[in-house]
Each structure stands twice: as structure tokens, then as C-alpha cells.
């Protein structure tokens, strides 16, 4: 099957995933800001896959083709995933900011690794791995400590966080095996694996988030019941 076919499969899958938060937003207008983040995750990914299907943003690095749209997608959508997790945990603005910055740093290092050859790409890969370790600390340690006592919110957060951590940890392994790394995976197989990982890490994330709408309703209700002048967060926000 041609590579472009897999890109179109990814585009259709992401577009289908975008319907879920849009429908939830229509049914529950109070969830709007949560649903807009979710719609951005799959909606922007659908646009990226469409451009790859059309052959746009493809560039040659050495003897391999790099699809810049894929990395631009990750540069935008992975922070949205982190943002959604932070919206559930509510750690404070400064903590959320450094988590988002860490995520962008990791993806930027990945872009640099994809666009370079030789020793440089491995240096950028190592830098990205170090950044990812910091991001994991935030996802596994910092955010859970900030969670409130509501069991529904905690359950939703843990489910989404675990999906994210497990799948995101597979991406660098797949990259190592790809033509950009040691070349065990050929281009078509690498593309298939990434489409599959993207689908689960984005569409499944969005689907579980929408299914957990009750947890979001509880957060919205808590906000509505909170006094106009809120207590300072642990971050001082």
C-alpha cells in the first residue's frame, strides 16, 4: 500500500475523532474550553495528515524523506494533550507552563534530529531524551500531586495520563528503529507504526476524555461554586 494511502487513513481517523468533542460541546456548552482543546488535538492532526497525503511539506535529508507536517503536528498537538491533563489536575500556571515548555523542547529536539545527519542527529536525540525525562517527571509526579479529591476526575486523569506516557515512550523507540535511526524499519513500516501510534495517542485520548464528561462536569460545577476570589495556588498563581 502506498505511503499516501496511510496518510489518508490517518487523516480520516483524526477527522472522525474530532467529531466526538464537537458533539460533546453541543450537548454540554459548559464543557466548551475542554472540548476545544480536544478538538484541536485531532483536528490539527487531521490537517497535518491531509498535507502529507497531498505530498506537501516533504523534504529530503540525506537519503531519506522527512515529512515536516508530522513534526509540526506534534509541536502543536502534544502541548494540547499536556494542557488537557493540566486542566484536569490544576497544578497552577507556572507548573503548567514548564510542562508545556518541556514538551515543546522535546519535540523541537526531535525536529532537529530528523533534519540532521551523522553525529548531530544523535546529539539532538539525546537532548530530547533528557527533556522527555523531565516531562515524565511532571506527568508522573507533579500533576498527580496537584489533583483534587474527586475520584472521577482522578480516574479520568490517570487513564489519560497512562495512555499518554505509554504511547509517547514508544515514539523514540520507533524513531530509533526507523530510517532516521538505525534503519531496521523501512519507510512504509515506520509510517504504518506512527499512524497507529498517532491514532491511539490522539483519537483514543480524545474518546476517553469525552467518555469522562462527568468528571469535566464536576470541575465546571466546582468552578461555578467557587468564590470570586480564589485562594492562591501552591505555585503562587
Swiss-Prot record:
The keyword Membrane applies. Pfam families: Bac_rhodopsin (PF01036). It is a multi-pass membrane protein. Keywords: Cell membrane, Chromophore, Membrane, Photoreceptor protein, Receptor, Retinal protein, Sensory transduction, Transmembrane, Transmembrane helix. SUPFAM superfamilies: Family A G protein-coupled receptor-like. Residues 1-2, 54-67, 116-119, 179-186 are extracellular. It is found in: Cell membrane. One of its GO terms (cellular component) is plasma membrane. Gene3D superfamilies: Rhodopsin 7-helix transmembrane proteins. InterPro entries: Arc/bac/fun_rhodopsins, Rhodopsin_retinal_BS. One of its GO terms (biological process) is phototransduction. The chain crosses the membrane at residues 3-23, 32-53, 68-89, 93-115, 120-147, 151-178, 187-214. The modification N6-(retinylidene)lysine is found at residue 202. Residues 24-31, 90-92, 148-150, 215-237 are cytoplasmic. One of its GO terms (molecular function) is photoreceptor activity. Photophobic photoreceptor responsible for the negative phototaxis. Activates the sensory rhodopsin II transducer (HTR-II) in response to blue light. Belongs to the archaeal/bacterial/fungal opsin family. Interacts with HTR-II. This is Sensory rhodopsin-2. It comes from Halobacterium salinarum (strain ATCC 700922 / JCM 11081 / NRC-1). The lineage of its organism: Archaea, Methanobacteriati, Methanobacteriota, Stenosarchaea group, Halobacteria.
Amino acid at each position: 500500500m502506498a505511503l499516501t494511502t496511510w496518510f489518508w487513513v490517518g487523516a480520516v481517523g483524526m477527522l472522525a475523532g474530532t467529531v466526538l468533542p464537537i458533539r460533546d460541546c453541543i450537548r454540554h456548552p459548559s464543557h466548551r474550553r475542554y472540548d476545544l482543546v480536544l478538538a484541536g488535538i485531532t483536528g490539527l492532526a487531521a490537517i497535518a495528515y491531509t498535507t502529507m497525503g497531498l505530498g506537501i511539506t516533504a523534504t529530503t535529508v540525506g537519503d531519506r524523506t522527512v515529512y515536516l507536517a508530522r513534526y509540526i503536528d506534534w509541536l502543536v498537538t502534544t502541548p494540547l494533550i499536556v494542557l488537557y491533563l493540566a486542566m484536569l489536575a490544576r497544578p497552577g500556571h507556572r507548573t503548567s507552563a514548564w510542562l508545556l515548555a518541556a514538551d515543546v523542547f522535546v519535540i523541537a529536539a526531535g525536529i532537529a534530529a530528523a533534519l540532521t545527519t551523522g553525529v548531530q542527529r544523535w546529539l539532538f536525540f539525546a537532548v530530547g531524551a533528557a527533556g522527555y525525562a523531565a516531562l515524565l517527571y511532571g506527568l508522573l509526579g507533579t500533576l498527580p500531586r496537584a489533583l483534587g479529591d474527586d475520584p472521577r476526575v482522578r480516574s479520568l486523569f490517570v487513564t489519560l495520563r497512562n495512555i499518554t506516557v505509554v504511547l509517547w515512550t514508544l515514539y523514540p523507540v520507533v524513531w530509533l528503529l526507523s530510517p532516521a535511526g538505525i534503519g531496521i524499519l523501512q519507510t512504509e513500516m515506520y509510517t504504518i507504526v506512527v499512524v497507529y501510534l498517532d491514532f491511539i495517542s490522539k483519537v483514543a485520548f480524545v474518546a476517553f476524555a469525552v467518555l469522562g464528561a462527568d468528571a469535566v462536569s464536576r470541575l465546571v460545577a466546582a468552578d461555578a461554586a467557587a468564590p470570586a476570589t480564589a485562594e492562591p495556588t501552591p505555585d503562587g498563581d
